[in-house]
Design a protein with these regions (language model features):
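C-terminal lobe and adjacent flexible extensions of AdoMet/dcAdoMet transferase-like proteins
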Residues: 186, 203-257
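Catalytic cores of RNA-modifying enzymes
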Residues: 1-205, 243-250, 257
Length: 257
């Protein structure tokens, strides 16, 4: 069965790596079930089955659902035929937290991360395969060239590290780029006083013109011009840490309230 470009499919064929990825997920917390996104032909799924851990998988491609059902011993309800971005995650394990795992479809991998952020109360850990460029941006430290809006927004909720670097030959068909598996671990989220919508707007606006100083890009949000004299506003977006962006949002909120 061939991979479909419309689903961003690149099937992982490196068995040793597949086993190692699942082993990492199983080690996070023995009491948590695992939700796999985009199981494809089941290279990760079979190790989940062997583990005896409670698990489910979300697959948008109905042909893959049929393939998995015909080739593996899978109980009714373990395969969810749906677009992951539309699944009500609070219903998957009846409100129970879970580990998010997958060789994520490259065409929606960033959206998967944003969805994990939205449901961070349910998802204490993410272990996923990404294009290396995307993975690097998700976990990039401030001050680096790859640090951007997705870095800041993710790191409010999760700390991250690369656990495997993966060459194109580990897939069929091989992608044209390198890949990475990263492990995200939940940390403290935004302070209750910070409005998520305002925080996102500030971060995305700041990086919308990353070569400009923040006093220029964020000027439309400022009513009290004295605030622009703050040291944070004299910097460019990549120079600010996550905590700096939280403080920036608080400052902007305070002048409105």
């Amino acid at each position: 069965m061939r991979a479909k470009k419309s689903y961003g499919q690149h099937f992982l064929i490196n068995e040793s790596l597949a086993g190692s990825i699942v082993k990492k997920a199983l080690a996070v917390d023995p009491d948590l079930p695992i939700l796999e996104v985009g199981p494809g032909k089941g290279v990760l799924t079979k190790y989940l089955i062997e583990s005896g851990r409670e698990w489910k998988a979300v697959e948008a491609d109905r042909d893959m659902i049929a393939y998995l059902s015909n080739n593996y011993d899978i109980a009714e309800g373990q395969l969810i035929s749906a677009d992951f971005l539309k699944v009500k995650l609070e219903e998957v394990f009846n409100g129970k937290p879970f580990i998010l795992l997958g060789n994520f479809p490259y065409n929606i991998s960033s959206q998967i991360i944003f969805r994990a952020m939205k449901y961070q109360d349910l998802i204490p850990s993410v272990i996923g395969m990404f294009q290396k460029e995307v993975a690097d941006r998700i976990i990039a430290p401030h001050g680096s060239k790859t640090y951007g809006a997705i870095s800041v927004l993710n790191q409010v909720y999760y700390t991250g590290k690369t656990i495997f670097k993966v060459s194109p030959g580990s897939f069929n068909p091989p992608p044209k780029v390198q890949s990475s598996v990263i492990h995200l671990t939940r940390q403290l989220s935004l302070p209750e006083s910070v409005k998520l919508s305002t925080f996102r707007t500030v971060v995305k606006s700041a990086f919308g013109q990353r070569r400009k100083m923040l006093r220029n890009t964020l000027k439309p949000f400022i009513k009290e011009t004295s605030l622009l004299e703050s040291g944070l506003f004299s910097k460019r977006p990549e120079q600010l840490s996550v905590q700096d962006y939280i403080q920036l949002t608080i400052d902007i909120q305070n002048q409105i309230e």
